[in-house]
């Protein structure tokens, strides 16, 4: 018997709207959109005087539509077995089996890390109990994260490992099965970026202190004006708002002029760098 595996990323976007739903929370960490479409894997088996063709279609973010001959509508997975009357030719082929896994069938998502002899990472999607005549069949799709040593030409190609009329096992090695963390993309890549990030944090903190100082000054002036006016009113004196405003402005200007020296004095007390002139204590 001669087995030939013909594997293709097939047929693009063919009229479907669902397939393996890439929007479910279990797949949020992955990039299945990058392999969106209908993929296929074919096995040819010599069965003289005929040839048996078993083709499985896998819809990624895309339902396998009726445009693929004989596939049930709204299928995530579809398997078609046909008999070629002429070897390597599907002309006048006779379809003998059709298996469909409906998109509404309940799925299980099983992430794995450091699995097997090759320490593989990825995720497995499991289908349980699809109706096929009087039988119930299962399917297991294994998506393996591609490593840096894998060649691009070997990626995104599905391989059929098992189909015994009870269970389907298919795998694919793809970058789409590698966990992508958006937070990591925002992290600085070098010390320069870290320095820039720290500068931004410092600037934000400085503006915060300036804002609080400004608020306290406004509150102080408001209390001063209202308190002064109330004091004049309580003494029975007429309130001269122009004189009061002029006095407030003069005091405010004096406060601003004395503020730098006041701040400098506070800093010197904290840092211990007060200027004691050219003399030192003995």
Swiss-Prot record:
Matches recorded under InterPro entries: Autophagy-rel_prot_27 (IPR018939), Man6P_isomerase_rcpt-bd_dom_sf (IPR009011), MRH_dom (IPR044865)
Gene Ontology terms: cellular component: cytoplasmic vesicle membrane; Golgi membrane; mitochondrial membrane; phagophore assembly site membrane
Membrane-spanning intervals of the chain: 207-227
Membrane-side (Lumenal) residue stretches: 20-206
Keywords carried by this UniProt record: Autophagy, Cytoplasmic vesicle, Disulfide bond, Glycoprotein, Golgi apparatus, Membrane, Mitochondrion, Protein transport, Signal, Transmembrane, Transmembrane helix, Transport
Glycan attachment points: 53
Keyword Membrane: yes
Residues in MRH domain copies: 20-180
Superkingdom of origin: Eukaryota
Record-stated family: Belongs to the ATG27 family.
Protein name, UniProt field: Autophagy-related protein 27
Organism annotation: Debaryomyces hansenii (strain ATCC 36239 / CBS 767 / BCRC 21394 / JCM 1990 / NBRC 0083 / IGC 2968) (Yeast)
